[in-house]
Amino acid sequence: MSAETKKTDVKKVVLAYSGGLDTSAIIPWLKETYDNCEIVAFCADVGQGSEELEGLHEKAIASGASECYIVDLKEELVADYIYPTIATGAIYEGTYLLGTSMARPIIAKAQVEVARKVGADAVCHGCTGKGNDQVRFEGCFAALAPDLKVIAPWREWEMVSREDLLDYLAERNIETTASATKIYSRDANAWHISHEGGELEDPWNEPTQGVWTMTVAPEDAPNTPEYVALELEQGKITKVNGEALSPYKALMLLNDLAGAHGVGRIDITENRLVGMKSRGCYETPGGTVMFAALRAIEELVLDKTSREWREQVGAQMAHLVYDGRWFTPLCESLLGASKPLADLVNGEVVIKLYKGQASAVKKRSPNSLYSEEFATFGEDDVYNQKDAEGFIRLYSLSSRIRALHGHNK
Protein backbone atom coordinates (compact mmCIF):
# COMPACT_ATOMS: atom_id res chain seq x y z
CA MET A 1 0.00 0.00 0.00
CA SER A 2 1.43 3.40 -0.97
CA ALA A 3 2.37 6.10 1.53
CA GLU A 4 -0.30 8.39 0.09
CA THR A 5 -2.96 5.75 0.66
CA LYS A 6 -1.97 5.26 4.29
CA LYS A 7 -3.01 8.71 5.42
CA THR A 8 -6.12 9.22 3.38
CA ASP A 9 -7.97 6.06 2.44
CA VAL A 10 -7.95 3.74 5.46
CA LYS A 11 -10.53 4.68 8.07
CA LYS A 12 -11.45 1.39 9.72
CA VAL A 13 -9.50 -1.88 9.75
CA VAL A 14 -10.56 -5.35 10.87
CA LEU A 15 -7.51 -7.16 12.21
CA ALA A 16 -7.25 -10.95 12.50
CA TYR A 17 -6.27 -10.91 16.16
CA SER A 18 -4.86 -13.67 18.36
CA GLY A 19 -3.68 -11.69 21.36
CA GLY A 20 -0.12 -12.82 20.78
CA LEU A 21 2.91 -10.61 20.50
CA ASP A 22 2.59 -9.88 16.79
CA THR A 23 -1.04 -8.80 16.72
CA SER A 24 -0.70 -6.90 20.02
CA ALA A 25 1.95 -4.77 18.33
CA ILE A 26 -0.03 -4.47 15.11
CA ILE A 27 -2.88 -2.54 16.76
CA PRO A 28 -0.83 0.51 17.84
CA TRP A 29 1.27 0.28 14.69
CA LEU A 30 -1.85 0.53 12.52
CA LYS A 31 -3.09 3.58 14.41
CA GLU A 32 0.28 5.30 14.06
CA THR A 33 0.88 4.34 10.45
CA TYR A 34 -2.61 4.79 9.07
CA ASP A 35 -3.50 8.19 10.50
CA ASN A 36 -5.17 7.03 13.72
CA CYS A 37 -7.62 4.75 11.92
CA GLU A 38 -10.13 2.73 13.93
CA ILE A 39 -9.08 -0.85 14.67
CA VAL A 40 -11.63 -3.62 15.15
CA ALA A 41 -10.10 -6.85 16.43
CA PHE A 42 -11.49 -10.14 15.18
CA CYS A 43 -10.69 -13.54 16.64
CA ALA A 44 -11.87 -16.83 15.18
CA ASP A 45 -12.57 -19.56 17.70
CA VAL A 46 -11.56 -22.61 15.69
CA GLY A 47 -10.94 -24.84 18.67
CA GLN A 48 -7.49 -23.55 19.63
CA GLY A 49 -8.42 -23.83 23.31
CA SER A 50 -10.16 -21.69 25.90
CA GLU A 51 -6.85 -20.57 27.39
CA GLU A 52 -6.02 -18.85 24.10
CA LEU A 53 -9.29 -16.88 24.22
CA GLU A 54 -9.30 -15.96 27.90
CA GLY A 55 -9.09 -12.20 28.42
CA LEU A 56 -8.76 -11.60 24.70
CA HIS A 57 -11.42 -8.88 24.49
CA GLU A 58 -9.86 -6.88 27.32
CA LYS A 59 -6.39 -7.29 25.87
CA ALA A 60 -7.49 -6.01 22.45
CA ILE A 61 -9.16 -2.94 23.94
CA ALA A 62 -6.11 -2.22 26.10
CA SER A 63 -3.92 -2.35 22.99
CA GLY A 64 -6.06 0.27 21.25
CA ALA A 65 -8.85 -1.60 19.46
CA SER A 66 -12.32 -0.07 19.55
CA GLU A 67 -14.01 -3.48 19.67
CA CYS A 68 -13.17 -7.19 19.63
CA TYR A 69 -15.37 -9.79 17.99
CA ILE A 70 -14.81 -13.43 18.98
CA VAL A 71 -16.67 -15.65 16.52
CA ASP A 72 -17.32 -19.32 17.29
CA LEU A 73 -16.48 -21.30 14.14
CA LYS A 74 -15.69 -24.69 15.66
CA GLU A 75 -18.65 -26.74 14.45
CA GLU A 76 -18.66 -25.08 11.03
CA LEU A 77 -14.95 -25.74 10.59
CA VAL A 78 -15.30 -29.46 11.20
CA ALA A 79 -18.61 -30.00 9.38
CA ASP A 80 -18.18 -27.72 6.35
CA TYR A 81 -14.42 -27.59 5.76
CA ILE A 82 -12.66 -30.56 7.35
CA TYR A 83 -15.11 -33.33 6.46
CA PRO A 84 -15.59 -32.25 2.82
CA THR A 85 -11.81 -32.02 2.41
CA ILE A 86 -10.96 -35.42 3.86
CA ALA A 87 -13.82 -36.94 1.86
CA THR A 88 -11.74 -36.21 -1.24
CA GLY A 89 -8.77 -38.07 0.25
CA ALA A 90 -6.66 -34.91 0.35
CA ILE A 91 -3.22 -35.36 1.92
CA TYR A 92 -0.45 -32.91 1.05
CA GLU A 93 2.78 -34.57 -0.10
CA GLY A 94 1.61 -37.91 1.22
CA THR A 95 1.64 -37.13 4.95
CA TYR A 96 0.22 -33.71 5.90
CA LEU A 97 -3.48 -33.67 6.80
CA LEU A 98 -3.72 -29.94 6.04
CA GLY A 99 -4.54 -28.78 9.57
CA THR A 100 -3.48 -25.16 9.23
CA SER A 101 -4.54 -24.89 5.59
CA MET A 102 -8.15 -25.99 6.12
CA ALA A 103 -8.74 -23.38 8.82
CA ARG A 104 -7.65 -20.38 6.78
CA PRO A 105 -10.66 -20.08 4.42
CA ILE A 106 -13.25 -20.06 7.21
CA ILE A 107 -11.23 -17.53 9.21
CA ALA A 108 -10.85 -15.24 6.20
CA LYS A 109 -14.55 -15.55 5.37
CA ALA A 110 -15.58 -14.64 8.91
CA GLN A 111 -13.13 -11.73 8.93
CA VAL A 112 -14.71 -10.36 5.76
CA GLU A 113 -18.17 -10.76 7.31
CA VAL A 114 -17.09 -8.72 10.34
CA ALA A 115 -15.59 -6.10 8.02
CA ARG A 116 -18.92 -5.78 6.21
CA LYS A 117 -20.80 -5.62 9.50
CA VAL A 118 -18.74 -2.75 10.92
CA GLY A 119 -18.27 -0.90 7.62
CA ALA A 120 -14.51 -1.37 7.43
CA ASP A 121 -12.55 -0.45 4.33
CA ALA A 122 -9.53 -2.66 5.07
CA VAL A 123 -8.54 -5.98 6.58
CA CYS A 124 -5.23 -6.84 8.19
CA HIS A 125 -3.37 -10.06 9.04
CA GLY A 126 -0.19 -10.83 10.96
CA CYS A 127 1.32 -13.37 8.58
CA THR A 128 5.01 -13.15 7.77
CA GLY A 129 6.29 -12.42 4.30
CA LYS A 130 7.96 -15.83 4.08
CA GLY A 131 5.04 -18.12 4.78
CA ASN A 132 2.05 -19.69 3.08
CA ASP A 133 -0.60 -18.02 5.20
CA GLN A 134 -0.20 -14.56 3.66
CA VAL A 135 -1.12 -16.10 0.30
CA ARG A 136 -4.02 -18.09 1.75
CA PHE A 137 -5.59 -15.13 3.53
CA GLU A 138 -5.11 -12.66 0.73
CA GLY A 139 -6.30 -15.15 -1.87
CA CYS A 140 -9.53 -15.55 0.10
CA PHE A 141 -9.88 -11.79 0.53
CA ALA A 142 -9.47 -11.34 -3.23
CA ALA A 143 -12.17 -13.92 -3.93
CA LEU A 144 -14.66 -12.68 -1.33
CA ALA A 145 -14.06 -8.94 -1.05
CA PRO A 146 -11.76 -7.54 -3.73
CA ASP A 147 -12.79 -4.00 -2.77
CA LEU A 148 -11.25 -4.24 0.70
CA LYS A 149 -7.70 -3.02 1.13
CA VAL A 150 -5.29 -5.54 2.63
CA ILE A 151 -2.62 -4.53 5.13
CA ALA A 152 0.26 -6.91 5.87
CA PRO A 153 2.47 -5.29 8.55
CA TRP A 154 5.29 -7.83 8.30
CA ARG A 155 5.82 -6.68 4.72
CA GLU A 156 5.82 -3.01 5.75
CA TRP A 157 7.32 -2.36 9.15
CA GLU A 158 11.01 -2.42 10.01
CA MET A 159 10.74 -4.70 13.03
CA VAL A 160 12.39 -8.07 12.43
CA SER A 161 12.44 -9.90 15.78
CA ARG A 162 10.45 -10.63 18.92
CA GLU A 163 12.80 -8.31 20.79
CA ASP A 164 11.86 -5.49 18.41
CA LEU A 165 8.16 -6.09 19.05
CA LEU A 166 8.62 -6.23 22.83
CA ASP A 167 10.57 -2.96 22.77
CA TYR A 168 7.88 -1.38 20.59
CA LEU A 169 5.14 -2.30 23.07
CA ALA A 170 7.21 -1.27 26.09
CA GLU A 171 7.81 2.18 24.60
CA ARG A 172 4.04 2.60 24.38
CA ASN A 173 3.32 1.18 27.85
CA ILE A 174 1.28 -1.67 26.42
CA GLU A 175 1.46 -4.75 28.63
CA THR A 176 2.07 -8.22 27.20
CA THR A 177 2.70 -11.63 28.70
CA ALA A 178 4.96 -12.56 25.79
CA SER A 179 8.70 -12.89 26.22
CA ALA A 180 11.76 -12.94 24.01
CA THR A 181 12.46 -16.55 24.98
CA LYS A 182 9.58 -18.12 23.07
CA ILE A 183 11.05 -21.11 21.28
CA TYR A 184 8.46 -22.38 18.83
CA SER A 185 5.90 -20.87 16.49
CA ARG A 186 2.65 -22.76 17.06
CA ASP A 187 -0.74 -22.71 15.39
CA ALA A 188 -3.63 -24.70 16.83
CA ASN A 189 -7.21 -25.52 15.93
CA ALA A 190 -9.63 -28.37 16.57
CA TRP A 191 -7.94 -30.55 13.95
CA HIS A 192 -4.27 -30.15 14.83
CA ILE A 193 -1.40 -28.12 16.20
CA SER A 194 1.75 -27.21 14.30
CA HIS A 195 5.20 -26.56 15.74
CA GLU A 196 7.93 -24.72 13.81
CA GLY A 197 11.06 -22.70 14.50
CA GLY A 198 13.79 -22.95 17.10
CA GLU A 199 15.99 -26.02 16.83
CA LEU A 200 13.41 -27.57 14.47
CA GLU A 201 14.78 -25.39 11.68
CA ASP A 202 17.72 -27.83 11.47
CA PRO A 203 16.32 -31.11 10.08
CA TRP A 204 19.22 -32.97 11.73
CA ASN A 205 17.76 -32.16 15.16
CA GLU A 206 15.30 -34.69 16.52
CA PRO A 207 12.25 -33.03 18.11
CA THR A 208 12.45 -33.09 21.89
CA GLN A 209 9.49 -34.07 24.03
CA GLY A 210 9.01 -30.37 24.78
CA VAL A 211 7.84 -29.85 21.20
CA TRP A 212 4.73 -32.02 21.42
CA THR A 213 1.63 -30.82 23.28
CA MET A 214 -1.38 -32.90 22.12
CA THR A 215 0.12 -36.39 22.21
CA VAL A 216 2.23 -38.51 24.53
CA ALA A 217 5.39 -40.11 23.20
CA PRO A 218 4.43 -43.42 21.57
CA GLU A 219 7.03 -45.25 23.64
CA ASP A 220 5.43 -43.85 26.81
CA ALA A 221 1.87 -44.67 25.72
CA PRO A 222 -0.08 -47.41 27.52
CA ASN A 223 1.12 -50.97 27.00
CA THR A 224 -2.47 -52.10 26.50
CA PRO A 225 -4.28 -51.15 23.28
CA GLU A 226 -7.57 -49.28 23.36
CA TYR A 227 -10.41 -50.02 20.96
CA VAL A 228 -12.71 -47.23 19.77
CA ALA A 229 -16.01 -48.01 18.04
CA LEU A 230 -17.15 -45.48 15.45
CA GLU A 231 -20.37 -45.17 13.47
CA LEU A 232 -20.37 -43.27 10.19
CA GLU A 233 -23.14 -41.78 8.10
CA GLN A 234 -22.45 -40.26 4.68
CA GLY A 235 -18.76 -39.88 5.41
CA LYS A 236 -19.15 -38.33 8.87
CA ILE A 237 -18.59 -39.86 12.29
CA THR A 238 -21.85 -39.66 14.21
CA LYS A 239 -21.13 -41.86 17.23
CA VAL A 240 -18.05 -42.64 19.29
CA ASN A 241 -18.34 -45.72 21.50
CA GLY A 242 -22.10 -45.55 21.10
CA GLU A 243 -22.42 -41.89 22.07
CA ALA A 244 -24.03 -39.55 19.53
CA LEU A 245 -21.87 -36.45 19.11
CA SER A 246 -21.68 -33.39 16.87
CA PRO A 247 -18.79 -33.30 14.38
CA TYR A 248 -16.74 -30.98 16.58
CA LYS A 249 -17.39 -32.84 19.83
CA ALA A 250 -16.59 -36.18 18.20
CA LEU A 251 -13.28 -34.78 17.01
CA MET A 252 -12.46 -33.43 20.48
CA LEU A 253 -13.13 -36.81 22.08
CA LEU A 254 -11.00 -38.57 19.48
CA ASN A 255 -8.20 -36.06 20.09
CA ASP A 256 -8.17 -37.06 23.75
CA LEU A 257 -8.40 -40.80 23.12
CA ALA A 258 -5.83 -40.94 20.34
CA GLY A 259 -3.48 -38.39 21.90
CA ALA A 260 -3.18 -40.57 25.00
CA HIS A 261 -1.77 -43.33 22.76
CA GLY A 262 0.69 -41.13 20.87
CA VAL A 263 -1.31 -41.20 17.63
CA GLY A 264 -1.03 -38.50 14.98
CA ARG A 265 2.55 -37.19 15.11
CA ILE A 266 4.42 -36.35 11.92
CA ASP A 267 7.73 -34.58 11.33
CA ILE A 268 8.05 -33.38 7.73
CA THR A 269 9.98 -31.05 5.48
CA GLU A 270 7.41 -29.67 3.08
CA ASN A 271 7.45 -27.55 -0.04
CA ARG A 272 5.92 -24.19 0.74
CA LEU A 273 3.81 -22.35 -1.78
CA VAL A 274 6.27 -19.44 -1.78
CA GLY A 275 9.09 -21.66 -3.06
CA MET A 276 11.16 -22.60 -0.03
CA LYS A 277 11.12 -25.74 2.06
CA SER A 278 10.14 -25.66 5.73
CA ARG A 279 10.26 -28.18 8.53
CA GLY A 280 7.16 -28.68 10.65
CA CYS A 281 6.10 -31.04 13.42
CA TYR A 282 2.36 -31.63 13.39
CA GLU A 283 -0.02 -33.39 15.77
CA THR A 284 -3.38 -34.57 14.44
CA PRO A 285 -4.53 -37.32 16.81
CA GLY A 286 -8.30 -37.30 16.29
CA GLY A 287 -7.95 -36.48 12.62
CA THR A 288 -5.68 -39.47 12.07
CA VAL A 289 -8.36 -41.73 13.56
CA MET A 290 -11.09 -40.11 11.46
CA PHE A 291 -9.07 -40.48 8.29
CA ALA A 292 -8.38 -44.15 9.05
CA ALA A 293 -12.07 -44.81 9.72
CA LEU A 294 -13.20 -43.21 6.47
CA ARG A 295 -10.59 -45.09 4.45
CA ALA A 296 -11.64 -48.37 6.07
CA ILE A 297 -15.27 -47.98 4.98
CA GLU A 298 -14.21 -46.74 1.55
CA GLU A 299 -12.30 -49.99 1.04
CA LEU A 300 -15.62 -51.80 1.40
CA VAL A 301 -17.92 -49.54 -0.60
CA LEU A 302 -15.93 -47.99 -3.46
CA ASP A 303 -15.27 -49.94 -6.63
CA LYS A 304 -11.85 -49.93 -8.26
CA THR A 305 -12.38 -47.10 -10.73
CA SER A 306 -14.07 -44.91 -8.11
CA ARG A 307 -11.10 -45.31 -5.77
CA GLU A 308 -8.67 -44.51 -8.58
CA TRP A 309 -10.61 -41.37 -9.47
CA ARG A 310 -10.83 -40.35 -5.81
CA GLU A 311 -7.04 -40.65 -5.48
CA GLN A 312 -6.63 -38.19 -8.36
CA VAL A 313 -9.16 -35.80 -6.85
CA GLY A 314 -7.45 -36.02 -3.47
CA ALA A 315 -4.09 -35.07 -4.92
CA GLN A 316 -5.59 -32.07 -6.72
CA MET A 317 -7.64 -31.04 -3.67
CA ALA A 318 -4.61 -31.18 -1.38
CA HIS A 319 -2.81 -28.62 -3.52
CA LEU A 320 -5.87 -26.37 -3.78
CA VAL A 321 -6.33 -26.30 0.00
CA TYR A 322 -2.62 -25.93 0.74
CA ASP A 323 -2.31 -23.13 -1.80
CA GLY A 324 -5.28 -21.17 -0.45
CA ARG A 325 -7.64 -21.73 -3.39
CA TRP A 326 -10.73 -22.80 -1.47
CA PHE A 327 -13.02 -20.16 -2.96
CA THR A 328 -12.50 -21.19 -6.58
CA PRO A 329 -14.73 -22.93 -9.13
CA LEU A 330 -12.32 -25.87 -9.30
CA CYS A 331 -12.42 -26.44 -5.55
CA GLU A 332 -16.21 -26.23 -5.55
CA SER A 333 -16.33 -28.70 -8.43
CA LEU A 334 -14.07 -31.23 -6.72
CA LEU A 335 -16.04 -31.02 -3.48
CA GLY A 336 -19.33 -31.46 -5.32
CA ALA A 337 -18.08 -34.34 -7.43
CA SER A 338 -16.77 -36.17 -4.35
CA LYS A 339 -20.03 -36.00 -2.41
CA PRO A 340 -21.77 -38.99 -4.09
CA LEU A 341 -18.85 -41.17 -3.04
CA ALA A 342 -18.86 -39.74 0.48
CA ASP A 343 -22.58 -40.51 0.73
CA LEU A 344 -21.72 -44.22 0.38
CA VAL A 345 -19.45 -44.15 3.42
CA ASN A 346 -21.86 -45.61 5.97
CA GLY A 347 -21.09 -48.25 8.54
CA GLU A 348 -19.15 -49.17 11.64
CA VAL A 349 -15.41 -49.28 12.29
CA VAL A 350 -13.38 -50.35 15.29
CA ILE A 351 -10.05 -48.54 15.57
CA LYS A 352 -7.21 -50.00 17.62
CA LEU A 353 -5.03 -47.36 19.31
CA TYR A 354 -1.60 -48.58 20.32
CA LYS A 355 1.84 -47.00 20.62
CA GLY A 356 1.34 -44.28 18.00
CA GLN A 357 -0.73 -46.35 15.58
CA ALA A 358 -4.42 -46.15 14.70
CA SER A 359 -5.48 -49.31 12.88
CA ALA A 360 -8.91 -50.28 11.61
CA VAL A 361 -9.36 -53.84 12.89
CA LYS A 362 -13.10 -54.28 12.26
CA LYS A 363 -15.34 -52.75 9.61
CA ARG A 364 -18.75 -53.31 8.08
CA SER A 365 -21.13 -51.35 5.90
CA PRO A 366 -24.65 -51.76 4.49
CA ASN A 367 -23.19 -50.48 1.20
CA SER A 368 -20.33 -52.98 1.15
CA LEU A 369 -19.29 -54.48 -2.18
CA TYR A 370 -17.28 -57.14 -0.39
CA SER A 371 -18.77 -60.63 -0.48
CA GLU A 372 -17.26 -63.39 1.61
CA GLU A 373 -18.92 -65.95 -0.65
CA PHE A 374 -17.08 -64.63 -3.70
CA ALA A 375 -13.79 -63.87 -1.97
CA THR A 376 -13.29 -67.13 -0.05
CA PHE A 377 -10.26 -69.28 -0.82
CA GLY A 378 -12.29 -72.34 0.12
CA GLU A 379 -14.89 -74.20 -1.88
CA ASP A 380 -17.80 -72.06 -3.03
CA ASP A 381 -20.93 -72.33 -5.13
CA VAL A 382 -21.14 -68.78 -6.48
CA TYR A 383 -17.94 -68.31 -8.48
CA ASN A 384 -16.83 -70.50 -11.37
CA GLN A 385 -13.07 -70.20 -11.51
CA LYS A 386 -13.06 -71.31 -15.15
CA ASP A 387 -14.75 -67.98 -15.99
CA ALA A 388 -11.42 -66.28 -15.31
CA GLU A 389 -9.88 -67.89 -18.41
CA GLY A 390 -11.89 -65.86 -20.91
CA PHE A 391 -11.37 -62.67 -18.91
CA ILE A 392 -7.61 -63.17 -18.86
CA ARG A 393 -7.48 -63.79 -22.65
CA LEU A 394 -9.29 -60.51 -23.32
CA TYR A 395 -7.40 -58.59 -20.62
CA SER A 396 -4.04 -59.64 -22.09
CA LEU A 397 -5.08 -59.40 -25.75
CA SER A 398 -3.01 -56.29 -26.54
CA SER A 399 0.08 -57.90 -25.00
CA ARG A 400 -0.50 -61.06 -27.04
CA ILE A 401 -0.86 -59.09 -30.31
CA ARG A 402 2.26 -57.06 -29.54
CA ALA A 403 4.26 -60.22 -28.98
CA LEU A 404 2.92 -61.91 -32.13
CA HIS A 405 4.02 -58.90 -34.19
CA GLY A 406 7.46 -59.01 -32.67
CA HIS A 407 7.24 -55.63 -30.96
CA ASN A 408 8.53 -56.94 -27.62
CA LYS A 409 12.00 -57.68 -29.01
UniProtKB/Swiss-Prot annotation:
<keyword id="KW-0055">Arginine biosynthesis</keyword>
<dbReference type="GO" id="GO:0006526">
    <property type="term" value="P:L-arginine biosynthetic process"/>
</dbReference>
<feature type="binding site">
    <location>
        <position position="270"/>
    </location>
    <ligand>
        <name>L-citrulline</name>
    </ligand>
</feature>
<keyword id="KW-0028">Amino-acid biosynthesis</keyword>
<dbReference type="InterPro" id="IPR048267">
    <property type="entry name" value="Arginosuc_syn_N"/>
</dbReference>
<dbReference type="GO" id="GO:0005737">
    <property type="term" value="C:cytoplasm"/>
</dbReference>
<dbReference type="Pfam" id="PF00764">
    <property type="entry name" value="Arginosuc_synth"/>
</dbReference>
<feature type="binding site">
    <location>
        <position position="132"/>
    </location>
    <ligand>
        <name>L-aspartate</name>
    </ligand>
</feature>
<dbReference type="GO" id="GO:0005524">
    <property type="term" value="F:ATP binding"/>
</dbReference>
<feature type="binding site">
    <location>
        <position position="96"/>
    </location>
    <ligand>
        <name>L-citrulline</name>
    </ligand>
</feature>
<feature type="binding site">
    <location>
        <position position="282"/>
    </location>
    <ligand>
        <name>L-citrulline</name>
    </ligand>
</feature>
<dbReference type="InterPro" id="IPR048268">
    <property type="entry name" value="Arginosuc_syn_C"/>
</dbReference>
<comment type="similarity">
    <text>Belongs to the argininosuccinate synthase family. Type 1 subfamily.</text>
</comment>
<keyword id="KW-0067">ATP-binding</keyword>
<keyword id="KW-0963">Cytoplasm</keyword>
<dbReference type="InterPro" id="IPR018223">
    <property type="entry name" value="Arginosuc_synth_CS"/>
</dbReference>
<comment type="pathway">
    <text>Amino-acid biosynthesis; L-arginine biosynthesis; L-arginine from L-ornithine and carbamoyl phosphate: step 2/3.</text>
</comment>
<feature type="binding site">
    <location>
        <position position="194"/>
    </location>
    <ligand>
        <name>L-citrulline</name>
    </ligand>
</feature>
<dbReference type="Pfam" id="PF20979">
    <property type="entry name" value="Arginosuc_syn_C"/>
</dbReference>
<dbReference type="InterPro" id="IPR024074">
    <property type="entry name" value="AS_cat/multimer_dom_body"/>
</dbReference>
<comment type="subunit">
    <text>Homotetramer.</text>
</comment>
<feature type="binding site">
    <location>
        <position position="132"/>
    </location>
    <ligand>
        <name>L-citrulline</name>
    </ligand>
</feature>
<feature type="binding site">
    <location>
        <position position="126"/>
    </location>
    <ligand>
        <name>ATP</name>
    </ligand>
</feature>
<feature type="binding site">
    <location>
        <begin position="16"/>
        <end position="24"/>
    </location>
    <ligand>
        <name>ATP</name>
    </ligand>
</feature>
<feature type="binding site">
    <location>
        <position position="128"/>
    </location>
    <ligand>
        <name>L-aspartate</name>
    </ligand>
</feature>
<feature type="binding site">
    <location>
        <position position="133"/>
    </location>
    <ligand>
        <name>L-aspartate</name>
    </ligand>
</feature>
<protein>
    <recommendedName>
        <fullName>Argininosuccinate synthase</fullName>
        <ecNumber>6.3.4.5</ecNumber>
    </recommendedName>
</protein>
<keyword id="KW-0547">Nucleotide-binding</keyword>
<dbReference type="InterPro" id="IPR023434">
    <property type="entry name" value="Arginosuc_synth_type_1_subfam"/>
</dbReference>
<dbReference type="InterPro" id="IPR001518">
    <property type="entry name" value="Arginosuc_synth"/>
</dbReference>
<dbReference type="GO" id="GO:0000050">
    <property type="term" value="P:urea cycle"/>
</dbReference>
<feature type="binding site">
    <location>
        <position position="44"/>
    </location>
    <ligand>
        <name>ATP</name>
    </ligand>
</feature>
<keyword id="KW-0436">Ligase</keyword>
<feature type="binding site">
    <location>
        <position position="185"/>
    </location>
    <ligand>
        <name>L-citrulline</name>
    </ligand>
</feature>
<dbReference type="InterPro" id="IPR014729">
    <property type="entry name" value="Rossmann-like_a/b/a_fold"/>
</dbReference>
<dbReference type="GO" id="GO:0000053">
    <property type="term" value="P:argininosuccinate metabolic process"/>
</dbReference>
<feature type="binding site">
    <location>
        <position position="101"/>
    </location>
    <ligand>
        <name>L-citrulline</name>
    </ligand>
</feature>
<dbReference type="GO" id="GO:0004055">
    <property type="term" value="F:argininosuccinate synthase activity"/>
</dbReference>
<feature type="binding site">
    <location>
        <position position="136"/>
    </location>
    <ligand>
        <name>L-citrulline</name>
    </ligand>
</feature>
